[in-house]
């Protein structure tokens, strides 16, 4: 979010108990030390740290990472390197655990090419491209992955129908019906 002529920064706010409004005013969550814009943050908790993946702007654009042990403390440690594995312009980082594995997937929108790139890591520092292992029959922009239970999947099928040709391999290589 941007105020006036200032940089875009990542804010946080809390929803009320009914999820109809926010409580109080949004507060800054993260602003890089260089005070340049940052957008598209996604956070994952691992080994006692919150890992924030975000897009830098105005100073070498790409996906960087910052970590903290206290999410709203304002005390972040920033990585110097870029995490994307392409020279193409990227945004919309999403990070999630690969169920049934000790690995994580970092995906991001290679927006000038209209595609996503998928990378894999066990330590959230070093990533390798795994595009060959991923197939998609849709074209999201700034996608998010949310794990769901088998019961939640069945409720979604009941409410919206099962997509034609749907077959998902879970962490135990089980095909979902």
What is each stretch, according to the model?
Residues 1-89, 98-171:
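Beta-rich carbohydrate-recognition and catalytic domains
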